[in-house]
Structure formats: structure tokens, C-alpha cells
Amino acid sequence: MNISIITFTENGTKLAEKIRQAFVGTKMEEAKKLGLSLSDWTRQQFAEKNAIVVIGACGIAVRMIAPFVSDKLSDSPVVVADEAGMFVIPLLSGHMGGANELAEQIAGQIGGIPVITTATDVNHTFSVDLFAKKCGLSIYN
């Protein structure tokens, strides 16, 4: 999985560096140094199927990704972390895209709390989509 991290503050950049060190090949970009609009950057990440880690507010992440969200089978996984690294939230494509697992991995690396909200996970029940993914089966939306 290719991971792209975007930050908006100095503290966010410091946290992104911790994450980047734990995940080989991760691209880290500061919003103010992008060289293109945030919308164009986000479009590019979705086109390349990169996982997106936003260090900042969930509201910013939602506004960034809204025009590009399509369906659970093709969306890029999106994870949000607050700049203090306290909470790591899979926002989009939790099961099929791997955002839940990525959030847990990131939280483990930075000492944060993964905030997993998918019903099958919080209720510890069987997940058809995770089963299909693990078995290499296809799901049609």
C-alpha cells in the first residue's frame, strides 16, 4: 500500500515524520509546499489508489475527499489523525481499502488510540467484506 501523508501545521509535520519512519516508502507532503491545489493533490492520490493520511481535523479531510468518493470497492483508504497523535480515525474504506488496519498500525507506532467505528468491528461479529478480501473473493457493489 502506498501511503501519502498531508499536514497543515508544524506539529502535524513532526507527527507525519514519525509515521513516515515506520512505513517505508511513505510520501509526506506539507499542504503549503504542495505546488498544486489541495483538490488536485487529493484527486491524484485517489487516481493512484494511494492511502491518504490527513494530520488535521476530520472536517478538513471530509471536504478534501468529498468530490472523489465513489464506492467502498474503489475508494482510497483515508485515515485522519489529530496533530497530537492521540486519535487515529479510519474515515473511508475501512475494510476493503484497509483504512481500519492502517489506523491500528499508525496508532501503534505513535502511541495513539485507533477509533474504529465499523459495526462488525465494534460488535466483534463476522464481516462478509473482510472475509471476501482475505479469501481473494470478489464483491460487487
Residue ranges: model-predicted function:
Residues 1-28:
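N-terminal basic/disordered segments at the start of proteins
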Residues 69-94, 101-117:
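Short, acidic/small-residue loops that bind anionic groups at enzyme active sites
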Residues 26-44, 139:
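A short, well-structured beta->alpha microelement
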Residues 27-32, 53-56, 80-81, 114-118:
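General beta-strand structural signal in soluble alpha/beta enzymes
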Residues 97-141:
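Internal alpha/beta core interface subdomains
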Residues 3, 7, 77, 87, ...:
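N-terminal loops that bind phosphate or other acidic moieties
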Residues 12-15, 60-64, 99:
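Short glycine/serine/threonine-rich phosphate/pyrophosphate-binding segments
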Residues 41-61:
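Short, structured active-site "lid" loops
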